[in-house]
Amino acid sequence: MWIQVRTMDGRQTHTVDSLSRLTKVEELRRKIQELFHVEPGLQRLFYRGKQMEDGHTLFDYEVRLNDTIQLLVRQSLVLPHSTKERDSELSDTDSGCCLGQSESDKSSTHGEAAAETDSRPADEDMWDETELGLYKVNEYVDARDTNMGAWFEAQVVRVTRKAPSRDEPCSSTSRPALEEDVIYHVKYDDYPENGVVQMNSRDVRARARTIIKWQDLEVGQVVMLNYNPDNPKERGFWYDAEISRKRETRTARELYANVVLGDDSLNDCRIIFVDEVFKIERPGEGSPMVDNPMRRKSGPSCKHCKDDVNRLCRVCACHLCGGRQDPDKQLMCDECDMAFHIYCLDPPLSSVPSEDEWYCPECRNDASEVVLAGERLRESKKKAKMASATSSSQRDWGKGMACVGRTKECTIVPSNHYGPIPGIPVGTMWRFRVQVSESGVHRPHVAGIHGRSNDGAYSLVLAGGYEDDVDHGNFFTYTGSGGRDLSGNKRTAEQSCDQKLTNTNRALALNCFAPINDQEGAEAKDWRSGKPVRVVRNVKGGKNSKYAPAEGNRYDGIYKVVKYWPEKGKSGFLVWRYLLRRDDDEPGPWTKEGKDRIKKLGLTMQYPEGYLEALANREREKENSKREEEEQQEGGFASPRTGKGKWKRKSAGGGPSRAGSPRRTSKKTKVEPYSLTAQQSSLIREDKSNAKLWNEVLASLKDRPASGSPFQLFLSKVEETFQCICCQELVFRPITTVCQHNVCKDCLDRSFRAQVFSCPACRYDLGRSYAMQVNQPLQTVLNQLFPGYGNGR
C-alpha cells in the first residue's frame, strides 16, 4: 500500500510506499522524516480534517490507497539571547508605528462605550420635549420597518429630539426643532415583544384610516395596500405602491401596482385584495387618532396555526408541548429558532441560563463526540465488532490489496446490472481485484460470486480456488462457494463440510433457464435464454487452465448457466457444480480474432494510480542498498561468500526481476488509433446543436495517450463532456436546451415540478411552457458507445 504526502503549501509531494492498513502513525512519521528531512516532533499530519495522533493506525483514520496526507511543519521557537536582540524584534504595534490598534488596545474601550451607555439616559432626559414633532404621545401611527419596507400599526410612547453633534455650537439648542431632528419612540401593536423602538420622522406617519373605493382608484396614484412578496396569492403585510394598471371584467377586477420594498421595488404585481386599498394620510391633513382605531388585517406570523391563540402550535409556541403560556420561561434555540419551556426540557431547567447562546437538544453538538486537535480518536462501535479487533493473531492483514478499499465506484449502471458494463470491452485487464471492483465488472473484493439469492448472479471470478474447476475456454465447469471454515479473518481454507444451494450458490442457479431445484439441480433446455453472467479470469487459475491471463485479471465476456448439479468433489464433500457456456458477440481474448481486437483497441494492463511510481521507487531503493553493500564489501576486502557457504550470484540482467512487473517488457506494442463507424460519424454530424462539444471530443482521437487505450480515453472524454449537471451521470434521454446545455429529461422534469423553469447549468429562463424534445441523434450515439447504460434509470 502507498499514499501521497504533501506539504501544506503544495510545493513538495512524495510517495510513501511499503505501508499497511495497520501501520502506526509514529512509523509513518519516521518514513516521512526520510523523505522530507523533518523531525517527527515537528510534524503535524492532517487527513480529512483530522490531525493524526500517535498510537493510532492508518486503518483507524480510514486512509485508503493513494490518498493524500497533508504535512504541516512546526516552527521551532528560537528565543533572543540578549536584551538588544529582543528589542530589535519588537513589532510595529509594540513600537507605536502601527496604524491599527494593538491587542491590548482592542480589548480596552478607553471608556468610550461605557460613557455612551451611561450618558444615553441623561441625554434623552435632557432633550425630551412634549411639544416636538407632528405626532404626540399616545397617538396611533404607522411605522415602517426599514429592513423590509412594510408599514405596521404602532403607538407613540415618547418624542425626543436628536442631541446636537459635536460640530454644532451649544446655542443651537435654542433654535426651533425641525421634523428631521425628531425621534419617535413607538411600540408596535402586533409585536409587543419588540418593546419600544426608536424611529426617524421619515419612517412614521399618521395611521391610515380611509379605504379608497374601486371606482376612485386611478393609474399613477400612490396608495397603501396588502401584498405578500413570497406568496403573492396569500395575505401579507402593508406596503406603499403606485398603481400601474386597472382592469375590470364582468366577473373579476384586476389591479396591478409597483410595490415599494424599502430601496427596491417589485413592478407590475397583481393585487389580490382590491377592496382593502388605503389612502396615505399626509402630515397635518387629518385629526390625530388617540382613540382605539380600526385594525387592519395582516398575514399571520405563523402559517401553521394562523395565529390562533386557542390552538396548540409547536412552531410558534413551545416546540415540545405547543403551549403559549409562560413566555418569560421560554428559551429560543440559536440554531433552529424554536421556543422551549425550561420545564419541558429533559432534564428540566430551574431557571433561564445566563449564557448568550443556547441550543436545543436536537441542535447542540455533544462535546464528548468532538475530537479536538491533539486528542485521540473515539472508539468505533463498528470496528470493535470486527474479527480483526477480537483476534489474538499478530499477523499483519493490512498489506493486501484487497484491504485498501475502493478509491472510486462504478455508477454508470446499478450494482444489480446484468450483462456487459458500458465502456468495458472484452479483453480489458486489471492488475488487482480491487480495480475490477472499481470498474463494476465484479464488485466484491474477495468473493468469487456476486449475486443475490432472490435475484440471480451478476458476475463471477474464475481463479482456480477449487480443485474441481475445469476450464475449456468457451465453456467451463465452476464450483460453488461454501463448505470451508473461514472464521476469524481467513481468506481461504480446505473443504471441511458439504456445500448448500443457498446464498450466492442459489443466486448462480437462478441464472439457469430452468425451475430451481435445490436437491438434484436442473438443466436448461434453452440455455441462451438464461440470465447473463460476466466472467473474469484471474492469473491464479493458470495452474489448471491455459486460458488464464499471464498477469492480473481479465474480463472474458458473457457466459450463461447451462446446468447445475450436486456431486461429491475431490475433497470427499458434496459440492455444487455449474456448467457455463460463452454467449458473447465479441471474440474471446485467447483467440486470434480476440487478440487482434485487443491490439486494435489498444487494451493494456491497467495499474492503480501511483502503482508504477511506487514500484519504481521500491526497485530504486533495492538497487541503492545493493550498491552500498557491494561498496562496503569491496572497501573492506570482504569475501564474496554471503552466509553459510553460499556464494553470491549476480543475475544476468543486472538485477532481480520481479514476476509480473510492468517493466519486464521493453518492446512497446504499436497501438492503432480508434476510429468511429460510418453511422456514428453521421449521427454526430446530425447533432448540430452540440457541434462545438463534438469537435472537442473528436480532437481527443488525434491525441496519443501516454497510458491506456485510445478507445477508453475517447469514452472517458465523451462521458465527461456529456455529463448531466443535475445527476452527475452520463445524460440519458438528453434535452439540449436553447442555451446549448444537455440535461436528462427526468432531471429537467423534476426541476419543472419544483417550479424551477430555468436551465440547471446557466439559469437561462426556459419558460413554463418549454417543450422538451429528446435529442435522438445524441441518444443513439451514446447507446452505441455505452450499450445498456440506461438500465435502472
From Swiss-Prot:
Its EC number is 2.3.2.27. PROSITE patterns: UBIQUITIN_2, YDG, ZF_PHD_1, ZF_PHD_2, ZF_RING_1, ZF_RING_2. Multidomain protein that acts as a key epigenetic regulator by bridging DNA methylation and chromatin modification. Specifically recognizes and binds hemimethylated DNA at replication forks via its YDG domain and recruits DNMT1 methyltransferase to ensure faithful propagation of the DNA methylation patterns through DNA replication. The record marks T479 as: Required to confer preferential recognition of cytosine over thymine. The lineage of its organism: Eukaryota, Metazoa, Chordata, Craniata, Vertebrata. Changing D142A: Impaired binding to histone H3 without affecting the protein folding. Interacts with DNMT3A and DNMT3B. Interacts with DNMT1; the interaction is direct. Interacts with USP7; leading to its deubiquitination. Interacts with histone H3. Interacts with HDAC1, but not with HDAC2. Interacts with BLTP3A. Interacts with PML. Interacts with EHMT2. Binds hemimethylated CpG containing oligonucleotides. Interacts with ZNF263; recruited to the SIX3 promoter along with other proteins involved in chromatin modification and transcriptional corepression where it contributes to transcriptional repression. Interacts with UHRF2. Interacts with FANCD2. Residues 445-446 are annotated as: Required to promote base flipping. One of its GO terms (molecular function) is nucleic acid binding. This is E3 ubiquitin-protein ligase UHRF1. Gene3D superfamilies: 2.30.30.1150, 2.30.30.140, Phosphatidylinositol 3-kinase Catalytic Subunit, Chain A, domain 1 (3.10.20.90), SRA-YDG (2.30.280.10), Zinc/RING finger domain, C3HC4 (zinc finger) (3.30.40.10). Residues 618-629 have a biased composition (Basic and acidic residues). It is found in: Nucleus. Residues 296-301 are annotated as: Linker. GO terms for cellular component: chromatin; euchromatin; heterochromatin; nuclear matrix; nucleoplasm; nucleus; replication fork; spindle. Residues 466-469, 478-481 are annotated as: Required for formation of a 5-methylcytosine-binding pocket. The record marks C316 as: Histone H3K4me0 binding. The modification Phosphoserine is found at S76, S91, S95, S165, S287, S298, S368, S639, S651, S707, S709. A zinc finger (RING-type) spans 724-763. Induction: Up-regulated in proliferating cells, and down-regulated in quiescent cells. Down-regulated upon adriamycin-induced DNA damage, in a p53/TP53 and CDKN1A-dependent way. Induced by E2F1 transcription factor. It is an enzyme of class 2 (transferase). DNA binds at A463, G464, D469. Residues 419-582 form the YDG domain. Residues 1-78 form the Ubiquitin-like domain.
